[in-house]
Amino acid sequence: MTRELESKYIYAVKELAEEFFVLTCGEHEGPRGVNRIIERSLRSTIMPKNKELYLRGLAACGVEYQDNNGEISFEGVSDKEINFLSKVPNLIRPKFDLIVKKIFPKLDQVDINYHAAKSICDTRFSPTINFNSLFDLVKKDSDKRKLIQISFEKMMNEIILKAESEGLKNSFFLHISPNLGNKNGKETIKLSTQDDIGSTDIQLLIKGAVKDSGVLFLLNKFIADKTGKAPFGRNFNFRNSPNSITGKIDLCKKTIQKDDMPLIIGVGDTVTSKKHNGKEIYLRGGSDRSFLEFIQILGNEFGIKNKIIFVDSSSGEVERPSTKKTGLKGISDIDDNLKFDMVFENGPKEYISWFIELASKRSNFKKKLTI
């Protein structure tokens, strides 16, 4: 709740104008939203709207669209779904107390309340249980971390069953970050080990709200703004998106002219690859993997050299494999189809410096074209 962004980065986004979109499983609005980070960073709640400095793009993994002045829309979501989502934090709270008391029997209620406030995220479209606060209590005890992960995954599945009992059978799914891929429509939790913290949060998301579907939505919007014609239709949203990457590629090939397809730079920090039971079989996942793979394949199909960038966030708030220490181990593998064009080993600060320079050069280049 105290995070800030470098103001130069916010203005660099503004310089890129219609060529920049954010695509995140966080949210724009609310006390924990990115809009509050923008306002804190600029020391103003008025300037971001007046100067159109909010981050344009999709949040809640593809549900919540926002333009630069903070106007928000969320097509494809029913009132019944929103009403249920609003109840989820209150459904989680008593279950949270029971789980924490079982794992930490010596913890008093004051401390439980403290960790509940940090762990239960009452975001509008993506109520979340985050483990980091509880992980701090167990330090390097990977068995305790596993117990936390397994207990809360079970709890979140109970929330899904509650939704189904209220007539919302095909409305929601659990997004686990980071994960080890998708099996039978469910994301596989990445259990903690001694050298990898594993999954750190579980979100209840609206079914269909995945980042690769978000790419389609943003692509449709970009081309519509550029040409006046939306290839997938003006009312396209995540619920209209094909489920598979192949289906998404086929839709693009059928409806988008090659001259209208832009070069896309995809940036992510959550990609995983782990050997399965010590065999030469890898479980590949991470909340950024699918949309980065989609961008890469899309470029290949249209003969465009799309770029894939990986930002190493291992030195941040979450323990993750470090490219500096172990290369791409735990992130990618020799047989991985996803290939990175750039890796920022020094993390977000290095990436932000590069981004600011890129935005300046791109802006100057476009100005020269108009002279």
Segment roles from a protein language model:
Residues 113-264, 269-277:
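Conserved acidic, metal-coordinating active-site core of Asp-based
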Residues 205-208, 212-371:
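Mg2+-dependent phosphoryl-transfer enzymes with acidic/Ser/Thr/Gly-rich catalytic loops
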Residues 63-68, 128, 316-319:
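A short acidic, often aromatic-flanked loop/helix-cap motif at beta-alpha or helix-coil junctions
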Residues 3-10, 34-42, 81-104, 141-167, ...:
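Well-ordered, non-membrane alpha-helical segments in soluble/globular domains
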Residues 68-80, 101-110, 165-170, 217-222, ...:
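Short secondary-structure transition/capping segments
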Residues 1, 62, 270:
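Anionic group-transfer/hydrolysis microenvironments
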Residues 4-124:
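Active-site phosphate-binding/coordination module
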